[in-house]
Amino acid sequence: MTPMRKTNPLAKLINHSFIDLPTPSNISTWWNFGSLLGACLILQITTGLFLAMHYSPDASTAFSSIAHITRDVNYGWTIRYLHANGASMFFICLFLHIGRGLYYGSFLHQETWNIGIILLLTTMAAAFMGYVLPWGQMSFWGATVITNLLSAIPYIGTDLVQWVWGGYSVDSPTLTRFFTFHFILPFIITALTTLHLLFLHETGSNNPLGIPSHSDKITFHPYYTIKDILGLFLFLLTLMTLTLFSPDLLGDPDNYTLANPLSTPPHIKPEWYFLFAYAILRSVPNKLGGVLALLLSILILAMIPILHMSKQQSMMFRPLSQLLYWFLIADLFTLTWIGGQPVSYPFITIGQVASVLYFTTILFLMPITSLIENKMLKWT
């Protein structure tokens, strides 16, 4: 008798995606992060839903409603810190997922890659809006500084900023619309994730060797479900350790002070996962140039399939490209560190050098290195 999972239309859909899915037999732990991102999304939607039940999206009550959630709501502090640290874990998994895609050449599945870039941008938008909601000092000034960047757009910039703010400054209307978008975006992310999976299953997963694996595939269940569950346990262990022992480790102390439009914090900075892009933004003296550099720091990912010059998909057997790849990772760590430092010498210079190296490595050094490696293949 045919199992129901192969006959029922809905069960068949789940079966083809998570049970009988043909998967390369040699994919490593680096392929775990896709499922972890799914777990992060479920966690964020669940905790966010409970927080939204008690949150008040108004400038006069937002800060006190967060204090109320933390102090008075049953396990409110747990839900709040799971949500805040869950966002950090989300971005850690996201960066590792993109890093794996770059290393093993998964970007050659272009539709999947491009939807992934849209997912990254949407997630960044959701996280930024979420950071504004507690209405602390860093929330308020972060919102003011980042939304003010829209004024760099010629002709329509100023009108656009006032339209986003809902007035002449960041206030209650801004908070209300940010809360609205922050609530709806995770559901848009879920829809985009479904599309991402749909296109991925059209081509099948890549593998560490970067070669076709049609002749050597195994079913996703039980082999990779067990592997993913192990990854999920390690993820939850890390998240719970962070939440229960150091919940404010990745946050900013300034956000425990009520937003005050008359007092600017000594150093305005976003959450740690945006610091690399913030450092690139600050490295350009011109406002419009900085905004363009900020956008390009993410959108440059869309150019990577075009810049791929190697005859091999994966970097597994390309030592020179591997060297450049790890140089790029080190450069991103440097940018993240610089983004959290004050705007003074020598941090400005280091940030500018790191920003130039970031774009130079991706646009010029990596394609040239790939061409050199192609030549080296002929010599062997």
UniProtKB/Swiss-Prot annotation:
A ubiquinone binds at residue 201. SUPFAM superfamilies: a domain/subunit of cytochrome bc1 complex (Ubiquinol-cytochrome c reductase), Transmembrane di-heme cytochromes. Its cofactor is heme b. It is found in: Mitochondrion inner membrane. Signal peptide: none annotated. It is a multi-pass membrane protein. The chain crosses the membrane at residues 33-53, 77-98, 113-133, 178-198, 226-246, 288-308, 320-340, 347-367. Heme b b566 binds at residues 97, 196. Keywords: Electron transport, Heme, Iron, Membrane, Metal-binding, Mitochondrion, Mitochondrion inner membrane, Respiratory chain, Transmembrane, Transmembrane helix, Transport, Ubiquinone. Pfam families: Cytochrom_B_C (PF00032), Cytochrome_B (PF00033). One of its GO terms (molecular function) is metal ion binding. One of its GO terms (biological process) is mitochondrial electron transport, ubiquinol to cytochrome c. GO terms for cellular component: membrane; mitochondrial inner membrane; respiratory chain complex III. The keyword NADP does not apply. Disulfide bonds: none annotated. Heme b b562 binds at residues 83, 182. Binds 2 heme b groups non-covalently. InterPro entries: Cyt_b/b6_C, Cyt_b/b6_C_sf, Cyt_b/b6_N, Cytb/b6-like_sf, Cytochrome_b, Cytochrome_b_C_euk/bac, Cytochrome_b_N_euk/bac, Di-haem_cyt_TM. Belongs to the cytochrome b family. PANTHER family: CYTOCHROME B (PTHR19271:SF16). The cytochrome bc1 complex contains 11 subunits: 3 respiratory subunits (MT-CYB, CYC1 and UQCRFS1), 2 core proteins (UQCRC1 and UQCRC2) and 6 low-molecular weight proteins (UQCRH/QCR6, UQCRB/QCR7, UQCRQ/QCR8, UQCR10/QCR9, UQCR11/QCR10 and a cleavage product of UQCRFS1). This cytochrome bc1 complex then forms a dimer. Component of the ubiquinol-cytochrome c reductase complex (complex III or cytochrome b-c1 complex) that is part of the mitochondrial respiratory chain. The b-c1 complex mediates electron transfer from ubiquinol to cytochrome c. Contributes to the generation of a proton gradient across the mitochondrial membrane that is then used for ATP synthesis. Heme 1 (or BL or b562) is low-potential and absorbs at about 562 nm, and heme 2 (or BH or b566) is high-potential and absorbs at about 566 nm. This is Cytochrome b. The gene is MT-CYB.
